[in-house]
Amino acid sequence: MRVRSLHALHGVFSRQVTPAVDLSDLLRAEVVLGVSALDHYMHELTRLGMLECFAGSRKNTEAFDRFPLPISIAGALSNPSTAQAIIEGEIRSRHSFLSFQHPDRIAEAVRLFSEVKLWEEVGKHLGTTAKEIKTALLLIIDRRNKIAHEADIDPSYPGQRWPIDSNLVERTLDKLQEIARAIFKVT
């Protein structure tokens, strides 16, 4: 994840400046970027999986078969040299406004190319339960949303931000990466 470079930058800066310089917003940016990386990864994995279904190298799922396509592209799909590019464009277009961050949305995306019971299999792969994995991801997403939409302000103490430190961010990034790798492995 590119966000690891930002984490390293925070580490370098924190050793070179006094505590009077608040670097916590770098950490907050890392959380936002980490979730963004998972979202992007899920978009790419879904697009590629759906293209494999279209090409016949992966078994179609019910969700794939129900994926809506405009009638206007029917003619273009009959041309093998352009069909894949047309389908790819439609997938990108239909998914461009969707977010694949919440566990339910991620599972919906995976169902477009795989019949796997996603969170059960991810939990097994990671030696835990589906509930624990989804809860961990939801906590990360909730924190990301507090940062992105609420300026990470603690409503109990107006003007004060929720605490954050390098270890919390490192664990967050590790968990996101662990989940992404497990999703790849089980799909």
Report residues per predicted region:
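Charged alpha-helical initiation segments
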Residues: 1-32, 57, 61-62
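Short secondary-structure junctions and interdomain/linker hinges
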Residues: 3, 10-13, 17, 116-120, ...
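Charged/polar positions within long, soluble alpha-helices
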Residues: 8, 39-50, 142-156, 177-185
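Non-transmembrane, amphipathic alpha-helical segments
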Residues: 18-30, 34, 129-132, 161-164, ...
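Short runs of predominantly hydrophobic/aromatic residues within well-ordered alpha helices
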Residues: 27-34, 38, 42, 140
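Helix-loop junctions and short alpha-helical segments
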Residues: 33-34, 41-133
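Amphipathic, Lys/Arg-enriched alpha-helical patches that create a basic surface
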Residues: 111-146, 160-187
